[in-house]
Swiss-Prot record:
Family: Belongs to the ABC transporter superfamily. Aliphatic sulfonates importer (TC 3.A.1.17.2) family.
Function: Part of the ABC transporter complex SsuABC involved in aliphatic sulfonates import. Responsible for energy coupling to the transport system.
Cellular compartments per GO CC: plasma membrane
Protein name listed in UniProt: Aliphatic sulfonates import ATP-binding protein SsuB 2
NCBIfam families registered for this protein in UniProt: PRK11247.1
Residues noted as binding ATP in the record, renumbered to the chain: G47, R48, S49, G50, C51, G52, K53, S54
Organism: Pseudomonas fluorescens (strain ATCC BAA-477 / NRRL B-23932 / Pf-5)
SUPFAM superfamilies to which the protein is assigned, alphabetical: P-loop containing nucleoside triphosphate hydrolases
Cellular localisation: Cell inner membrane
TM region(s), chain numbering: none
Catalytic activity: ATP + H2O + aliphatic sulfonate-[sulfonate-binding protein]Side 1 = ADP + phosphate + aliphatic sulfonateSide 2 + [sulfonate-binding protein]Side 1
Length: 268
C-alpha cells in the first residue's frame, strides 16, 4: 500500500432490521422497526430528541441488546460483523496523553504506523501525526476519530451526531469529507442527526423516527455533488421538516434533558 492512494475497502454490509423493539423499564423506545438497507447505502436518521434514533444506532453497534426482533448483516446475525463495524460519537474521545498517530492506531499490533499515517492522509491530517490532541481544533479532532475508524477498514460506519458541536463551515467540510470517503470505500453508513439539511445534503435516504416508529422513509434521488441552496434540495428539506414539526395529534413539546448514556465505547 502507498500513502498516496488508500485501498478500496470491502463492500458495505447489507442490513436488515426486523420487528425491532427496545424497552427501558416500562418505557418502549422502539416499536417494531422494520428496515432493509442495501450494502453501501448512506442513510440519515432524523427525529425529535427522545424519539429513539440514537437507541437504534446503539443497538446496531452492539452497545445495547434489543428487547425483541432481529438485526441481520445479510442473512447472518449483525453481531457476527462487529469487527467490521465502527461508531463515531459527537465527541472525538481522543486520549490526550497520546499523540495523534497513536490515537489512530490505538489497540493495534504489529507495524501499524504506515496504515495510521495513510488514514490520516485520507482525512487531510498527515502533517499533524506527531502533535498532541490539545493542539487540534474540534473539526480536526473529529477527522482523527474518522481516521481511527478508517484504519480498521469498516464495512459499516455508524455516526451518532459526530458533527453536532462543530461550527457551520467546519461542519460542511466534514460532511464533504465523509461523503467523499464513503464514495471511495463503499461502506454502509447510518448517520443520526438533528440537522435535516445535513441529512438531505449527503444521504441516499432519510428515515424519520416518530415515537419509536418509522414515520417517513424518503429516498433522496438527486445527483452528486448536491448543490446546497438549490430548489430541489430545499423542497426535500421542507418536506422532512414539516413532518418533524407537525406530528399528527402530537403538539410540539420541549426537548427533554437526556440522561448520560450508561454504556459507551470508543470506535476502536
Amino acid at each position: 500500500m502507498t500513502a498516496q492512494q488508500p485501498p478500496r475497502l470491502l463492500q458495505g454490509i447489507p442490513l436488515a432490521v426486523r420487528k425491532l423493539q427496545k424497552t427501558f423499564g416500562s418505557r418502549q423506545v422502539l416499536r417494531e422497526i422494520d428496515l432493509h438497507i442495501p450494502a453501501g447505502q448512506f442513510v440519515a436518521v432524523v427525529g425529535r430528541s427522545g424519539c429513539g434514533k440514537s437507541t437504534l444506532l446503539r443497538l446496531l453497534a452492539g452497545l445495547d441488546q434489543p428487547s425483541a426482533g432481529e438485526l441481520l448483516a445479510g442473512s447472518a446475525p449483525l453481531s457476527a460483523a462487529i469487527e467490521d463495524t465502527r461508531l463515531m460519537f459527537q465527541e472525538a474521545r481522543l486520549l490526550p496523553w497520546k499523540k495523534v498517530i497513536d490515537n489512530v492506531g490505538l489497540g493495534l499490533k504489529g507495524n501499524w504506523r504506515p496504515q495510521a499515517l495513510q488514514a490520516l492522509e485520507a482525512v487531510g491530517l498527515a502533517d499533524r501525526a506527531q502533535e498532541w490532541p490539545a493542539a487540534l481544533s474540534g473539526g480536526q479532532k473529529q477527522r482523527v476519530a474518522l481516521a481511527r475508524a478508517l484504519i480498521h477498514q469498516p464495512r459499516l460506519l455508524l455516526l451518532d451526531e459526530p458533527l453536532g458541536a462543530l461550527d457551520a463551515l467546519t461542519r460542511i467540510e466534514m460532511q464533504q469529507l465523509i461523503e467523499r470517503l464513503w464514495q471511495q470505500h463503499g461502506f454502509t453508513v447510518l448517520l443520526v442527526t438533528h440537522d435535516v439539511s445535513e441529512a438531505v445534503a449527503i444521504a441516499d435516504r432519510v428515515i424519520l423516527i416518530e415515537d419509536g416508529e418509522v414515520g417517513l422513509d424518503l429516498h433522496v434521488e438527486l445527483p452528486r455533488p448536491r448543490v446546497r441552496g438549490s430548489h430541489r434540495l430545499a423542497a426535500l428539506e421542507t418536506e422532512v421538516l414539516n413532518r418533524v414539526l407537525s406530528l399528527p395529534g402530537s403538539p410540539p413539546e420541549p426537548e427533554p434533558v437526556s440522561p448520560l448514556p450508561t454504556q459507551l465505547r470508543w470506535a476502536l
